[in-house]
Amino acid sequence: MSFTEHPLRRWAVDEMRLRRFAPVAAHSEIYQVVRLIEADERNAEDRWLINARPDFDDWALAPRHGSGHTLGGIHFLWERHTEASTLTLIFPQETPEPARHNYIQWLENWPGGVVRATQIRIMPSAENIDAELSAIGISTDEMVCCDINAGIRLWSDFSIHGDGYGRLLITAGDLGEGERGRIIQRVQELGNYRNLALLGFPVVQQYGPQLDQLEHRLSDHARRVALADEDEEIALLFDGS
């Protein structure tokens, strides 16, 4: 390796490593929530994950990730990061509303504070885009549209709606369910990690000026020590000013 690697680089890569996403059908809906889980909430999360879950026909659980699947096509994904957990539900479009209810309630009552919550609707084509935008509640006044890959196009107003969710509307594109899922996963990871990173900004804004003052005082003190003679230097070393 010809360059010096930051000691935290490997940790950051492992933290952001994309676990395989579930397949996403061309006409489906996704609910994803990222929650900040405090250390004293981890046991509550484990109990909720194991004991409160709705019915799944297939269920697999490891220390940092888990998944569930029903014969009706509902997928659940859970991934534990260092400070947060990502929860994902994927519903086929034909899933009746009563069948969705228990799964969504389970997701919404999860322990921890919500950092990001997104409702994603995948549609086969953009043929009825105006009606779809209206149905999902995306404001055309604030809307952004972009092409991603292989015919996948995304619309969003990047705002939090009355139910607490952001909204994404995505065309299915010309690719398989597995690759579509991986692309949607990558798009979501960008927003999820951005929100997690921004959580530190208020602390920086609050304590940044104090750190600047301390830095100036330390610099001034070092300058005075450098210019002082031996007796003055000893006095300055014990000077708290």
Question: Where are the predicted features?
Answer:
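N-terminal pre-transmembrane cytosolic regions of membrane proteins
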Residues: 1-125
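Extended alpha-helical interaction modules
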Residues: 79, 89-239
